[in-house]
């Protein structure tokens, strides 16, 4: 199997949803083959952001990132967005050439917006296409709601766990929704 068939999965945790106001606080990446088998796991990086930004998070982010321990990891981190971008690019470059893989994940359009704003070199590494599991979820919800019942997620809102959830969710749809 060609490395060109590999898929890059990325998840970001942010201080909110608006890239004009909010920032990235955690990122992780996984590379799979075309059959969704994990080939390699990239660095899981808590990205330092100032307390002033963390204090402005809405209630959901404050509660969720506080309960998971992410807020504390962000405060203790010394890694900048630029360093996180570089570490991730170095990892990806060991496994694929730029432009080979779409950006894969759940609601990945949101992650791409933050990458464009804060990590443009990383965003440029991906093919312009997206492989968005949430699109398949929306189709299943409309056409085969019974398929959704088998989807199991950790829901921790930690980047690496969320990627694993997305890969497992797509496996479920492949096995129960698509006729291959």
Curated annotation (Swiss-Prot):
GO terms for biological process: DNA metabolic process. Its main location: cytoplasm. Its EC number is 3.1.15.-. It is found in: Cytoplasm. One of its GO terms (cellular component) is cytoplasm. Pfam families: RNase_T (PF00929). Keywords: Cytoplasm, Exonuclease, Hydrolase, Nuclease. The active site is at 128. It comes from the Bacteria. Residues 7-170 form the Exonuclease domain. Belongs to the oligoribonuclease family. 3'-to-5' exoribonuclease specific for small oligoribonucleotides. This is Oligoribonuclease.
């Amino acid at each position: 199997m060609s490395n060109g068939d590999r898929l890059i999965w990325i998840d970001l945790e942010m201080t909110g949803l608006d890239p004009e106001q909010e920032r990235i606080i955690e990122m992780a990446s996984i590379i799979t083959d075309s059959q969704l088998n994990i080939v390699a796991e990239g660095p899981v990086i808590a990205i330092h952001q100032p307390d002033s930004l963390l204090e402005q998070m809405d209630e959901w982010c404050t509660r969720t990132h506080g309960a998971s321990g992410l807020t504390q990891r962000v405060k203790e981190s010394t890694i900048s967005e630029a360093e996180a971008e570089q570490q991730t690019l170095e990892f990806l470059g060991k496994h694929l050439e730029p432009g080979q893989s779409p950006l894969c994940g759940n609601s990945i359009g949101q992650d791409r917006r933050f990458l464009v704003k804060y990590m443009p070199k990383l965003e440029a590494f991906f093919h312009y296409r997206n492989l968005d599991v949430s699109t398949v979820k929306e189709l299943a919800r409309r056409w085969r709601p019974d398929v959704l019942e088998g989807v199991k997620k950790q829901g921790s809102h930690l980047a690496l766990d969320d990627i694993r959830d997305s890969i497992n969710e797509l496996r479920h749809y492949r096995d129960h929704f698509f006729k291959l």
